[in-house]
Amino acid sequence: MIFVRDGQVFLAKRHGAHGEDTWASAGGHLENGETFEECARREAMEELGVTVGDLRFLCVSNIIAYGKHYVDIEFLGDISGQEPRLMEPEAFIDSGWFPLEDLPEPLFLAMGHALDSYKTGQMYYPGH
């Protein structure tokens, strides 16, 4: 999920998992019986301590990277009036708001797709 505010996107640097030292945002796996939207909201609360309001679907990606193969569903989430904070220090080591035109590198592959989708409207990213 991405959060955009005033031309900036919130990103956190991954730690202790696949894609280590890449920049991403909240995300994770579905729990049994959970919808995509419920999962996105739960992960945002667990990892960043924010309650997501409106969600807008961005894209789906077939990702083969980091020694894994997974399907990624991305949303744009509204967290108006809230400031994300790292709730899981074992998962992220740094964070901040970054201008959409000057992003840190490297981006987690799914985050790159989400940001490209936000900018271009592309909704499907085939496997790499």
Regions found by a protein language model. Give the residues of each.
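Short, charged/polar surface micro-motifs in flexible loops or helix N-caps
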Residues: 4-9, 17-19, 31-32, 76-83
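Active-site-adjacent beta-strand/loop module that shapes the phosphate/pyrophosphate-binding cleft
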Residues: 61-84, 111-119
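Nudix hydrolase/Nudix homology domain
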Residues: 18-20, 89-128
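The catalytic Nudix box helix
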Residues: 25-57, 75
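A generic structural micro-feature
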Residues: 22, 65-71, 89-92
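Conserved hydrophobic/aromatic beta-strand scaffold that supports enzyme active sites
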Residues: 11, 74-76, 97
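N-terminal strand-loop-strand
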Residues: 1-24, 52-56
